[in-house]
Amino acid sequence: METVKVTRKDLLLSPENKEIDSLDDVSALLSQRLSNVFEFSIASEEVQSDEVFEDTYPNDDQATFNLFSDVNTVVTKVTEPSIKNSRPLNYYILEDSPERQRQLQASVFTYDQLMKAKEEKWPACQKLHKVVSIKKEESKHRRRPSKKRRIRMKLLREKEEQLKRQAMAAKRNRFRKNVRKLPNKKKH
C-alpha cells in the first residue's frame, strides 16, 4: 500500500466534501465509502426487510441472546421423574389381623400379674449396703487456706521442727556429759 500525505487544507478544499442536501445522497455516499473499505455486497432493494430478518434469524430457542447470563453457562434440561414424598396409608393406620391380636395379648400385663409381682422378693433391692446416707456434717467441705496462711503455717512448722531438733541435740549433749562424769569401771 502506498502512503499518501493528506493535510487539513486538502481535506477542506476537496470536491468530495460538498454539502449534501438529501438523505439519499448521504446514504449513497456512506455506502460507497464503506464498500471501498470493507467490500460489502449491496443487498437489492426488491427483498422486503421482514423477509430478510426471517431468513437470517429463524425462530429458534438457541438463537436467543441472554443479556445477563454467564458466557460459559450451559443449560441442559433434564427431566427427572418426580419422587413421591408421602408415606403409604398403612404406615399411619394399622389393620387389625389375628396375628397382631395374638402379639398384643402376649404383651399385655394384667392387674393380677402385677399384684403377684409385687409379692415377689427382689434380691437386688434387699441389699442394705446399696443405700447411701449422707449426713449434714459430711456435706460441708473444708476450705483450703489462703496462700499467705499456708506460707505462715509452713514457717511455723519449720520453726517447731528446728526447736525440736535443738531440744534433742541439747538432750544428747547433756547425756554425753553425764556419761563422761561417770567413773570408769575396769573389767577384771
Curated annotation (Swiss-Prot):
Pfam hit, one: DUF2011
Biased segments, Basic residues type: 171-188
Keyword Nucleus: yes
GO CC annotation: nucleolus; nucleus
Keyword Nucleus: yes
Domain of life: Eukaryota
Residue ranges, annotated region (Disordered): 165-188
Keyword field: Nucleus, Phosphoprotein
Protein name: Uncharacterized nucleolar protein C630.06c
Organism: Schizosaccharomyces pombe (strain 972 / ATCC 24843)
